[in-house]
């Protein structure tokens, strides 16, 4: 399975307890539904994806914790911190209108209402309140644009661009 076939769904975070559990930092809005996928794909950024069996997933407090096959204790869990979690696109539901997987936004050009190119989406950040587009300009300056309707006017995937209300000098 290549990186292009995998949609990144989240990232493993800190260990939870001493029996191999990890906090899951999801990039989506329904991580409990991931329990339906017995096989996850995991990788560190820039490394090849590999299969990993999910042993358990549960809500805990305001978050989600997971137990993966082969992660038996806290030491093993500590070594998994930062690992990306993904799934093959065909295993995921299709998105509704104005819903997007983050991976579909990465690489799109960002154009403002004055038809000025702000840059290219290189990643996203989840802040809790909303997602934030990481946009790298041609000047190698990274700009952070909130992914909210007041800023993002249209996502035109077929045209390869996102239209925004944002000044080129902001």
UniProtKB/Swiss-Prot annotation:
Q: Which InterPro entries match?
A: PRC_barrel-like_sf, PRC_RimM, RimM, RimM_N, RimM_N_sf, Transl_B-barrel_sf
Keyword Chaperone on entry: yes
* Coiled-coil stretches: none
Q: Name one Pfam family in it.
A: PRC_RimM
Instruction: Give the GO biological process terms.
Output: ribosomal small subunit biogenesis; rRNA processing
Q: Where in the cell is it found?
A: Cytoplasm
> What is one term from the GO cellular component aspect held by the record?
cytoplasm
Q: Where does the record place the PRC barrel domain? A: 97-170
Alphabetized UniProt keyword annotations? Chaperone, Cytoplasm, Ribosome biogenesis, rRNA processing
Q: Name one GO molecular function term.
A: ribosome binding
Q: How does it assemble?
A: Binds ribosomal protein uS19.
Domain-related comment: The PRC barrel domain binds ribosomal protein uS19.
Record function comment? An accessory protein needed during the final step in the assembly of 30S ribosomal subunit, possibly for assembly of the head region. Essential for efficient processing of 16S rRNA. May be needed both before and after RbfA during the maturation of 16S rRNA. It has affinity for free ribosomal 30S subunits but not for 70S ribosomes.
Q: Which family does it belong to?
A: Belongs to the RimM family.
- Entry's PANTHER family? RIBOSOME MATURATION FACTOR RIMM
Its name, as the record gives it, is Ribosome maturation factor RimM
Organism in which the protein naturally occurs: Dechloromonas aromatica (strain RCB)
Gene field: rimM
């Amino acid at each position: 399975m290549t990186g292009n076939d995998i949609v990144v769904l989240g990232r493993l975070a800190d260990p939870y307890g001493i029996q191999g559990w990890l906090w899951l930092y999801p990039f989506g809005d329904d991580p409990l539904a991931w329990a339906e996928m017995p096989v996850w794909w995991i990788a560190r950024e820039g490394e090849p994806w590999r299969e990993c069996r999910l042993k358990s997933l549960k809500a805990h407090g305001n978050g989600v914790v997971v137990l993966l096959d082969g992660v038996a204790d806290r030491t093993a869990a500590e070594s998994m911190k930062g690992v990306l979690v993904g799934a093959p696109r065909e295993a995921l539901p299709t998105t509704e209108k104005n819903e997007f997987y983050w991976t579909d936004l990465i690489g799109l050009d960002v154009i403002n209402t004055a038809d000025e190119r702000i840059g290219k989406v290189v990643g996203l950040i989840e802040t809790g309140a909303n997602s934030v587009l990481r946009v790298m300009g041609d000047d190698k300056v990274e700009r952070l644009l909130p992914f909210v309707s007041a800023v993002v006017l249209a996502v035109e995937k077929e045209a390869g661009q996102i239209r925004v209300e944002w000044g080129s000098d902001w």
